Amino acid sequence: MYHYISDEHVPNMSESCQCTGSEFKRSINYFKNNGYTFVSLDKALKIIHNKLQQKFVVITFDDIPDCVYTNAYPILKQLNIPFTIYITYNFIDKESFITKEHLLKLKSDPLCTIGAHTMNHPMLRHCKNSLYEIQQCKIALEGLTGCNVEHFAYPYGQLAVVSKSNINMVKAVGYKTGVSAIGAPLTSESTKNLFFLPRIIINGISY
């Protein structure tokens, strides 16, 4: 799980969300050199369901800043690595976030899966309009891109800010999965609940 990929440090952003271009490359090389296969989230779930003995990694980005398009995407494209981007809809075209033009280019690449990350990035447990945030993001992204948006990422991704009701909403409105920021690998045990899957945050100090 990545957020911000840039050599430009952002003072008011958590260090856990920041990764330079060279650090991103180093993390990718770590997985390559240690026998991991890069797969889509859908492929990962099939591997687990079929109990295949395969080391794999799923690359995901949240929010997403435009530097993911300019700095991370060329590396992923060159290496033919699938990835998922979880879009906060009302961040599109905002300063430093992905532009509509770049999003539409990404949606045309079969390596890219587009997922939803709410309309405005609220703490869902404390949000009165949580159903709207969850459902409308799916509707809006499908309308903009023409893609089926089947995967969801919870803003902040911790149990303290995601309720059981929120998790049920994600299932009810038609998503196939919901991902958290709970730091654990995807295993047969951790994927029993497809609507609160774990992810491991990767940043500049991870490798």
Predicted segment positions?
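Active-site glycine- and acidic-residue-rich loops that bind
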Residues: 92-97, 160-161
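C-terminal active-site subregion of NodB/CE4 polysaccharide deacetylases
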Residues: 1-60, 67, 126-207
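Structural detector of well-ordered beta-strand residues that form the stable sheet scaffold
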Residues: 84-86, 113-115, 176-179
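Surface-exposed cleft-lining segments at the edges of enzyme active sites
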Residues: 87-92, 120-127
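Generic enzyme active-site microenvironment
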Residues: 60-61, 115
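Histidine-centered catalytic micro-motifs
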Residues: 4-5, 114-121
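Short active-site segment of divalent metal-dependent hydrolases/proteases
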Residues: 65-66, 120
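Acidic (Asp/Glu)-rich catalytic clusters
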Residues: 32, 73-81, 98-116, 143-145, ...
